[in-house]
Design a protein with these regions (language model features):
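Adenosine-nucleotide cofactor-binding segment
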Residues: 144-177
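Rossmann-fold NAD(P) dinucleotide-binding segment
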Residues: 166, 172-188, 204
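A short, aliphatic-rich alpha-helical micro-motif
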Residues: 160-162, 183, 207
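A short helix->loop->beta-strand "cap" motif at the edges of active sites that frequently abuts
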Residues: 144-145, 184-187, 209-210
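Glycine-rich adenosine-cofactor-binding loop
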Residues: 105-108, 116-143, 152
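Rossmann-fold NAD(P)-binding glycine/threonine-rich loop
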Residues: 192-244, 262, 267
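N-terminal ligand-binding/catalytic initiation module
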Residues: 1-101, 109, 119, 269-270
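C-terminal catalytic lobe of FAD-dependent flavoproteins
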Residues: 247-281
Length: 281
């Protein structure tokens, strides 16, 4: 059996960021329930962490096998295996790191798009790695950007954060990156850097002043240090797609879930089959 393999270049060619966002939005609008998924399995290994992330849909099953490396190495290395849902035979393999780099900002933007102001956006991004740059690319695909400032350990917190419409946190930080008192009242903040309950990128004041959107309430209370360390409860959290219209200060806290990889992998496969109608799964 020879399986199709989608490397980073193929994934980027077949599913540009705006189509990845649309795939996530369609899945959620179509009734996908993030709370129905199973938690990731995590194992500490000498150089970092090993993760297994399985998910199932009406047409496919899939699993991502990923490692999260300690500082100084590429953070995420992964492979994704997609299975046909009817036969359970392997259907395709994917570069799991590229899939992660695409799906994480797609989910973030799907979560906050209803709350983005209708003007060119000033964006501040903490983190110059794949996720920081992926969020920049995805935001630019769905909105006009007036300015983008990238903040790193070397640069510190830019003064422009006070004017930012959107702040993205995509780092390995374990403590808040900035004082939220410096932010606009109507800011949209995206925090996706950690899935550990003892690490956070934003402070308690932001968590308590914002509408806090999460992928799944139980997952956030188990894995998201921004939520846990702020002392938030289930009543303080809003599942993705359920935030009230008109919310002004918004925080999306994402830790990454297996359904997201499956949704985007299926979208890549559909795009390839659409481009090559005779190709069987």
């Amino acid at each position: 059996m020879t399986l199709p393999y989608y490397d980073a270049a193929a994934i980027e060619r077949l599913l540009p960021p705006e189509r990845a966002v649309a795939a996530v939005e369609r899945a959620l609008a179509g009734g996908l329930d993030p709370s129905a998924g199973v938690p990731r399995t995590s194992m500490k290994v000498p150089a970092g962490e090993l993760l297994l992330m399985p998910a199932v849909s009406g047409t496919h099953a899939g699993v991502k096998v990923a490692t999260v490396a300690d500082r100084g190495r590429p953070r995420v290395n992964a492979v994704y295996v997609l299975f046909d849902g009817a036969t359970l035979r392997p259907a395709a393999l994917f570069d799991g790191a590229a899939l992660t780099t695409l799906r994480t900002p797609a989910v973030s933007v799907a979560a906050v798009r209803p709350f983005l102001p209708a003007r060119p956006l000033h964006v501040v991004i903490f983190g110059a790695g794949p996720q920081g740059l992926g969020h920049r690319r995805t935001l630019a695909a769905v909105a006009e950007l007036s300015a983008v400032d990238i903040a790193t350990r070397a640069t510190g917190v830019p003064a422009s954060i006070a004017a930012a419409d959107v702040v993205v946190c995509a780092t390995t930080a374990r403590e808040p990156l900035f004082d939220s008192a410096r932010l606009r009242d109507d800011v949209v903040v995206i925090a996706v850097g950690s899935h550990e309950p003892d690490a956070r990128e934003v402070d308690t004041a932001l968590c308590r002043s914002a509408t806090v959107i999460v992928e799944d309430v139980a997952t956030a209370l188990r894995e998201c240090g921004d939520v846990v360390l702020a002392g938030l409860t289930a009543d303080d959290l809003v599942p993705i797609g359920s935030a009230p219209a008109g919310a002004t200060r918004v925080l999306f806290k994402g830790s990454g879930m297996a359904w997201q990889d499956l949704v985007v992998a299926e979208a890549v496969l559909r795009a390839d089959q659409g481009a090559h109608p005779g190709r069987a799964e």
